[in-house]
A protein has these predicted regions:
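Membrane-embedded catalytic cores of phosphoryl/pyrophosphoryl-handling enzymes
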Residues: 107-226, 401
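Short helix- or helix-capping micro-motifs
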Residues: 346-354, 403, 407
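Transmembrane-helix motifs of polytopic, lipid-linked glycan transferases
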Residues: 69, 137, 320-345, 378, ...
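Transmembrane-lumen/periplasm boundary regions of multi-pass, lipid-linked membrane glycan transferases
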Residues: 263-264, 271, 405, 416-545
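Membrane-interface transmembrane helices that cradle and orient dolichyl/undecaprenyl
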Residues: 140-149, 338-344, 379-396
Length: 777
């Protein structure tokens, strides 16, 4: 084996050193990763879907289903098991033309202030096998199966990228060879597995489609002029055949929902992201169950309580019900559309929802929004059944219950009552129900559900009302200004991104156009009234106060329902350009959703990570490292002989430290180790729980203040594209601040420990300042 290792290193030295030249120094870093790869990939993907026909669609689906699991679970698992250091780590004099720093062992991260920092996650220095080679050869194999001539450009590209990994000093030849064999192998194996599954499941569950396509990789010749079920509106079919086709789409929808549920659960189990501030804060609520809380109703705490009792105080336990809620929503929408529109439209609605960033993130983050959207949608669907001619009282009772549970999730649910008023005004036939007891019983149930919140607020000085009024700037008179117009435009811009630009425009267009073409359709009028009023209320409110993008979340699904019904009707009337827009929307949406789930993909594509300031995952990363840094300081202080606890300057930091410090997590319910700083008035839930004053007298403490992520300098994009060091893209870390006055009053002495940079994969994600506080009065 020794001679093989020598041969491996010798070939590497020859390629990395002997073959080096100024031309390759430009070409090879570009081949490994460049800023044009992502746009080129997006264009290639859209062309494949647009011009590739059935083969193109299946090829794209197989690439998505095989490459990501292969890279994440096969390559990464082997890398961590083998743990072979990369050449630039293990060897000296390794050339790295793609890097701006000298080669050799990875330099230790230094901190501007010279203070020690929390242990940081080092960049991935495992070498065997090469993921670049595996991904490219897997893609080459898959493309070759669907398009035989694709090897003429895919194979040279795969070889070029693989060679560049050697030239750039990132891999040994054996790494690249193993990656190429592994990638081609799992690419072929994945295709074989899906082909075998289709031959069995397709024949049983999708017989009409299986008759047309008995194989996923071998297509029978298509007679000229024979329409496909995706490319043409289906011709009139006999009732039984139409029902069978609808059942096919319904089953496909069920499978897609199940796959998304499993994928989201696996994503949570992977540990790629940690808790956000709100999740950690509300996790503490779940340890103190009550009728309500300072700023939110009670259901979020009870949901997290149930999740953590099922799976423990883990990130998975806290977030478990978010993917479950997403699956329930998909099921409700699919069944609703299958009954009221058609199953094909229902499937595409579920697909569109999954390609919408705001809604996709709601399937992995456990905040109040998933609960709010769930009960808003459930009330909308049961309400539709309630207003049907001849409907009994039962659907109204369910509607009242869903409205009430929605209120116990988020106070925005009160605006759904406004939506009902708008509907009764716009749709005269529905007013007959106002002469029946159903709507009033629903209202009574809704009001009964408000009792816990009202009781708790009466006991706590109506603090929630004060808080909500303060957030809405209710006491501030409206004054027109350019800043309000800027907020208005900013709100539209942010929402257009979070709702997918193509789907956002399509939804707005449908919400306006249906009044001219289909205003006599009760489905469209009802769904319009269940979503658009909420969106318009918040849009207009931006002219008075700042509105957060997630506030309109309950309105999105009703607006998308209107969009799908309207454009499905237009498709059946012969508007064929819709297919291209749908493909573009899905392609853009899934790419954005993928990057928002794992922003490190940017580094794999362009060769460098995003600056933390614009990384969408900054708020859910590096907190375990931050907690270790704080805990080390506390343990050092406690070693002096007195017990020591922790004080945090922000509710989110309090929650994060309570969750990620093991001792704090174990005692958070009865004897907290981490406290929020003392305040004279209620600004969060911690005000209503016992604090450290009076309970920790005579003890020492570590005070932690998070200073945030360093802002970016002007022109950072150019510097980032040029590959300049990440430190040069951000402004200097904020200067240390004086200790807060209340600390000086509460303790005998306060010592500034300085600033600490918290690193994640070599980048500064957070900066904190800590103080040693001795002898609490």
């Amino acid at each position: 084996m020794h001679w093989l290792l020598n041969l491996d290193v010798g070939v590497f030295r020859f390629i990395n050193g002997t073959l080096s030249n100024s031309v390759f120094d430009v070409i090879m870093p570009f081949a490994s990763g460049n800023p044009f790869f992502f746009p080129a990939l997006a264009v290639a993907g859209m062309l494949l879907l647009w011009k590739g026909g059935k083969r193109g669609w299946l090829c794209a689906v197989m690439l998505a289903l095989i490459l990501w699991p292969g890279d994440s679970f096969i390559c990464n698992t082997i890398k961590h098991a083998v743990a072979r250091p990369r050449p630039f780590v293990a060897l000296t004099d390794v050339r790295q033309p793609a890097a701006k720093h000298p080669s050799g062992p990875a330099p230790r991260m230094e901190h501007p202030q010279g203070n020690p920092a929390a242990p940081a996650s080092e960049p991935n220095h495992n070498s065997m096998p090469s993921s670049h080679a595996a991904n490219w050869f897997a893609a080459t194999m898959i493309c070759y199966v669907f398009f035989r001539r694709s090897w003429k450009f895919m194979l040279p590209l795969a070889c070029l990228v693989s060679f560049s990994r050697l030239y750039n000093g990132m891999h040994y030849p054996s790494d690249v060879l193993a990656g190429a064999i592994l990638g081609a192998g799992y690419g072929a194996a994945g295709l074989w597995a899906f082909e075998s599954l289709w031959r069995v499941a397709g024949r049983k569950w999708f017989p009409l489609w299986w008759e047309k396509f008995p194989s996923l990789v071998n297509f029978p010749p298509q007679p000229a002029g024979d329409p496909d079920f995706e490319d043409e509106a289906p011709p009139p079919l006999e009732e039984t055949r139409h029902a069978s086709l609808d059942a096919h789409w319904l089953r496909l929808g069920y499978i897609f929902i199940a796959v998304c549920l499993c994928a989201n659960l696996v994503y949570l189990l992977s540990g790629l992201i940690g808790l956000s501030d709100d999740e950690a804060y509300q996790w503490i609520w779940s340890k103190h169950l009550a009728l309500s809380y300072y700023s939110k109703p009670l259901l979020i705490a009870y949901t997290q309580w149930l999740g953590t009792h099922l799976w423990g105080d883990t990130v998975f336990g806290v977030r478990f019900f978010s993917p479950v809620i997403g699956a329930i929503l998909g099921f409700l929408l699919l069944r609703f559309f299958a009954r009221e529109v058609n199953a094909r439209a229902g499937f595409f609605l579920v697909l569109i929802v999954s390609a919408t960033p705001l809604l996709a993130l709601g399937s992995v983050l456990m905040t109040i929004d998933p609960l709010s959207v769930l009960f808003w949608t459930a009330a909308m669907i049961s309400g539709w059944r309630a207003i049907q001619p001849g409907a009994k009282t039962g659907p109204w009772l369910w509607t009242g219950l869903w409205l009430g549970l929605g209120f116990l999730s988020k106070y925005t649910e009160l605006l759904q009552l406004v939506c009902w008023v708008v509907f009764f005004i716009l749709w005269k036939p529905a007013r007959v129900h106002l002469r029946k007891p159903g709507p009033y019983l629903a209202l009574v149930i809704n009001l009964l559900c408000t009792a816990p919140v009202l009781i708790w607020n009466r006991q706590h000085g109506w603090i929630t009302v004060i808080h909500v009024a303060s957030n809405a700037s209710a006491n501030r008179p409206w004054e027109p200004s350019w800043s309000h117009l800027a907020d208005f435009a900013s709100f539209l811009g942010v929402e257009s991104f979070l709702l997918n630009p193509i789907f956002f425009i399509a939804a707005i267009w449908a919400g306006i156009a249906f009044w001219r073409r289909a205003r006599h359709d009760p489905r469209l009028v009802y769904l319009f009234c269940m979503g658009s009023p909420l969106f318009l209320i918040y849009l207009l409110f931006t002219l008075h106060s700042r509105v957060l993008p997630n506030w309109i979340a309950p309105a999105v699904l009703p607006m998308f329902c209107v969009m799908v019904i309207y454009w499905d009707t237009r498709w059946r009337l012969g508007v064929r350009s819709l297919k291209s827009w749908l493909v573009a929307g899905l392609a853009i949406g899934f790419l954005v959703v993928g990057f928002m789930h794992e922003s490190s993909l940017v580094q794999h594509i362009v060769g460098r990570p995003l600056p933390p300031k614009i990384d969408p995952l900054t708020r859910v990363r590096a907190y375990p490292a931050l907690a270790r840094t704080v805990e080390e300081a506390r343990e050092k202080l406690e070693a002096e002989g007195k017990p020591a606890f922790i004080i945090a300057g922000h509710y989110g930091t309090t929650g994060q430290l309570s969750f990620y410090i093991p001792e704090a997590r174990a005692t958070v319910a009865d004897h907290p180790l981490v406290y929020f700083q003392t305040t004279t008035n209620a600004i969060n839930q911690f005000y209503f729980w016992p604090g450290y004053v009076g309970n920790r007298t005579g003890q020492n403490a570590i005070y932690v203040k998070e200073l945030g992520t360093p802002p970016l300098v002007k022109g950072w994009i150019t510097s980032w594209l040029e590959g300049k060091p990440m430190e040069s893209l951000a402004r200097p870390v904020p200067a240390a601040k004086a200790p807060p006055a209340f600390l000086l009053q509460e303790f005998d002495s306060v010592k500034d420990l300085g600033l600490y940079n918290i690193y994640y994969r070599g980048r500064i994600f957070h900066t904190i300042q800590m103080f040693e506080c001795r002898n609490l009065h």
